[in-house]
């Protein structure tokens, strides 16, 4: 159990010892298994280690999905070195009636440019469900074959099918 929790980003050191109560508290969280593909230059984010700023994991460094727009300019080189790309497939496990609110990192945000009635405007967005919304979930990233990924960033991507 400890090995899986370490790999899922539970913030446990190699010599950590958990009581049964602590282990069950970690295992009682919602879980997601995320299939990612090798980064072949497509635009977008990917899996990274992130320091959590709010919620049940404040202060911990956990594996997270980070969108390219969330990176500061001085971090763009780090993003370019990423070995894997955004999630392709996701398997989620949660308990009926389980509140997901404690597992959200509300401190994450993105500044984006959108078009509203023909004019470009800057908007503040909170990351979606698979980003900050699943921050406190137990996350496990696994590599899957690249043929599983069919990106659609624009209508032209629908034509470029190999």
Predicted regions and their residues:
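OB-fold and OB-like single-stranded nucleic-acid-recognition modules
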Residues: 1-162
């Amino acid at each position: 159990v400890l090995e899986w929790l370490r790999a899922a980003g539970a913030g446990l050191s190699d010599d950590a010892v958990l009581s049964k109560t602590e282990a069950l508290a970690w295992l009682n969280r919602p879980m997601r298994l995320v299939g990612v593909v090798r980064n072949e230059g497509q635009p977008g984010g990917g899996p990274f280690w992130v320091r959590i700023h709010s919620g049940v994991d404040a202060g911990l460094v956990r594996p997270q999905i980070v969108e390219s727009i969330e990176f500061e300019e001085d971090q763009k080189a780090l993003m370019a070195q990423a070995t894997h790309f955004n999630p392709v497939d996701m398997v989620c496990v949660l308990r009926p009636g389980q509140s997901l609110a404690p597992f959200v990192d509300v401190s994450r945000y993105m500044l984006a440019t959108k078009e509203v009635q023909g004019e470009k405007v800057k908007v503040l967005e909170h990351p979606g469900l698979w980003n900050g919304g699943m921050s406190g979930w137990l996350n496990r990233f696994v590599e899957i074959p690249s043929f599983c990924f069919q990106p659609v960033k624009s209508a032209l991507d629908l034509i470029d099918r190999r």
